[in-house]
Amino acid sequence: MAAPSGGVNCEEFAEFQELLKVMRTIDDRIVHELNTTVPTASFAGKIDASQTCKQLYESLMAAHASRDRVIKNCIAQTSAVVKNLREEREKNLDDLTLLKQLRKEQTKLKWMQSELNVEEVVNDRSWKVFNERCRIHFKPPKNE
């Protein structure tokens, strides 16, 4: 699932997390998807499993790339905000509001960076399940 066309709101971490949750739907439902679309041995002749696995592979690749872009884009945006706040803080050491805002943005940045680790786990799980069911029907290209 691609990111919404209106762009991604990186300012509110809760919205960022909700977007990722929606974008991870394909990964959350992969077992169900494979069970309903890739035939068992007894039904192998009725459905083109290689085409089904290829389509699922392409969907997973697109979803993973899209989420990776969203996460890295938000990390870059938030890093820039943190950098600017640090520079302002150096000029105004007595400004407690500025310090509070800097801490808030630093925390948000750490949470966003931790989403990269979550993403790695989600992707690994999806590829494991995909390979268990599709390895005999579809071989992904070597360069990906």
UniProtKB/Swiss-Prot annotation:
One of its GO terms (cellular component) is mitochondrial intermembrane space. Keywords: Acetylation, Coiled coil. Pfam families: MIX23. Residues 82-120 form a coiled coil. The modification N6-acetyllysine is found at residue 100. InterPro entries: MIX23 (IPR019171). The modification N-acetylalanine is found at residue 2. Belongs to the MIX23 family. This is Protein MIX23. The gene is MIX23.
